[in-house]
A protein has these predicted regions:
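N-terminal beta1-alpha1 cap of cysteine-dependent amidohydrolase-like domains
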Residues: 1-77, 81
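Short amphipathic alpha-helical segments
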Residues: 17-18, 39-40, 90-93, 124-126, ...
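Short glycine-rich anion-binding loops that position phosphate/pyrophosphate groups of nucleotides
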Residues: 33, 83-86, 117, 158
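Hydrophobic anchor at the start of a short beta-strand
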Residues: 55-56, 111, 194
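Short, active-site-adjacent cap segments at secondary-structure transitions
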Residues: 86, 118-121, 186-188
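Class I SAM-dependent methyltransferase SAM-binding "motif I" and its flanking Rossmann-like core
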Residues: 90-91, 97-159
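Conserved anion/nucleotide-ligand pocket segment
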Residues: 144-149, 153-191, 197
Length: 200
């Protein structure tokens, strides 16, 4: 399974430019739809274009399943923006896109997860609840994540405006295998394991 998980894609995406150049990218901004600030969505879009990708944007919360399936099957890379991780995970499970995603990843496609998109890869997303509110219309009975990795990404570590909350999560969930990353770091996961890489 190939994953690239980060806090802020436009700051570190160039580290994997060879994985993006000339590739078809399914761009999922769904997590950002409930957020006030969404500047990171536009900056990610710009970087993909700069790196030579062909981008198809699709919102899994409103699009028909067959359309999502078609876009995912056609893509080389599947990218999830940051935003509200509970809303994103709810929509993934509600629409069946979670199973669709796993099927495509089994084919060797690359998933890029930024912030919320990285958090959802863990076995559960409950550990990160202090960073964002659970929507009132959250429809799941539990806080299960995609369970693609056996550790828990803590994005924006010691980075404003998340400095205090990330410190608190590190302390309160010290029993979990947390992997804190700042906005200049990314985690590369492949068949050989995982490693943190950094943008100078």
């Amino acid at each position: 399974m190939k994953l690239f998980l980060c806090s802020h894609f436009s700051s570190v995406g160039s580290l994997i430019k060879e994985e993006i150049d000339n590739k078809k990218v399914a761009f999922i901004p769904t997590a950002s739809l409930r957020e006030g600030y969404t500047g990171y969505v536009g900056s990610a879009r710009k970087l993909f274009n700069k790196l030579g990708a062909t981008v198809t944007e699709i919102d899994i919360s409103t699009e028909a399943y067959l359309t999502i399936q078609s876009v995912f099957e056609d893509a080389d890379v599947i990218y999830f923006t940051g935003g509200n991780f509970f809303f994103l995970m709810d929509q993934l499970r509600k629409t069946g896109t979670d199973k669709l995603l796993k099927k495509e990843l089994e084919k060797g496609k690359l998933m890029i997860g930024e912030s919320a998109g990285a958090i959802i890869c863990a076995p559960t997303i409950q550990y990160i609840e202090q960073m964002d509110e659970k929507p009132e219309d959250y429809s799941q009975e539990d806080d299960a994540g995609l369970d693609l990795i056996d550790f828990y990404v803590l994005p924006h570590y010691l980075t404003a405006p998340f400095k205090k909350v990330t410190e608190k999560i590190m302390t309160e969930f010290s029993d979990l295998n947390l992997c804190p990353i700042n906005n200049r770091q990314g985690i590369v996961i492949d068949g050989e394991g995982s490693k943190v890489i950094c943008k100078d």
